Amino acid sequence: MKRLKAYLKDGINVAAVMCLGDTISQFFFDKKSLDEWDAGRTLRFGIVGLVFVGPTLRRWYHFLESRVPKTYSPMRRGVTKMLVDQTLFAPPFTMAMSFLVPLSNGEPIDRIRQRILDSYLSILVRNYMLWPAAQMLNFRFVPLGYQVLYAQFIALVWNCYLSMILNS
């Protein structure tokens, strides 16, 4: 039960930040008025955070913690975790998000496939402009129990970008 609560807590935190990111994206980047705001889109983006992003990140960070030797210096552990995260996790996670967000908005699979072909590489390149440094700080200085929350503060900016690209 304690483990379920931890997953739920992370899922709720991630959902809230993703909803905020989508709302910011709609108002500031899409220039929508309050009457034009697509609350359903915001809710769907948040649900992806609740059921996929939060639990996935929690599991991934615990996996990294268990696999990177604790005998490494703190700096080496942080660098190792960041490199593994950005090489093994970021590409498939980005692909999953590129699929799930449009799917949650009811886009047909053929359109999602084309969207991925058109935007996946540019999203991944931009991922590498932000996340390696952010994750290095996360894995080096943030205690394991707070790593998902820390990542979500960084993700507020990232989610605005993702929402803008994946909901266009």
Swiss-Prot record:
Disruption phenotype: No effect on lifespan under normal conditions but reduced lifespan under stress conditions such as starvation; adult flies show an increase in glycolytic flux. Reduced mitochondrial DNA copy number in the fat body, but not in skeletal muscle. Mitochondria in the fat body appear swollen and lack inner membrane cristae. Conditional RNAi-mediated knockdown in neuronal tissues results in significant defects in learning and locomotor functions in larvae but no defects in adults. Keywords: Membrane, Mitochondrion, Mitochondrion inner membrane, Transmembrane, Transmembrane helix. Pfam families: Mpv17_PMP22. GO terms for molecular function: channel activity; monoatomic ion channel activity; uridine transmembrane transporter activity. It comes from the Eukaryota. The chain crosses the membrane at residues 12-29, 41-61, 82-101, 144-166. It is found in: Mitochondrion inner membrane. One of its GO terms (cellular component) is cytoplasm. It is a multi-pass membrane protein. The keyword Transmembrane applies. The record marks D85 as: Determines ion selectivity. GO terms for biological process: homeostatic process; mitochondrial genome maintenance; mitochondrion organization; monoatomic ion transmembrane transport; regulation of mitochondrial DNA metabolic process; uridine transmembrane transport. The keyword Mitochondrion applies. Changing R41Q: Decreased channel conductance. Belongs to the peroxisomal membrane protein PXMP2/4 family. Non-selective channel that modulates the membrane potential under normal conditions and oxidative stress, and is involved in mitochondrial homeostasis. Can translocate uridine, but not orotate, across a lipid membrane. Involved in maintenance of mitochondrial ultrastructure. May be involved in mitochondrial DNA (mtDNA) maintenance but does not appear to be directly involved in mitochondrial deoxynucleoside triphosphate (dNTP) pool homeostasis. May be involved in the regulation of reactive oxygen species metabolism and the control of oxidative phosphorylation. Part of a larger complex that may be a homohexamer. This is Mitochondrial inner membrane protein Mpv17.
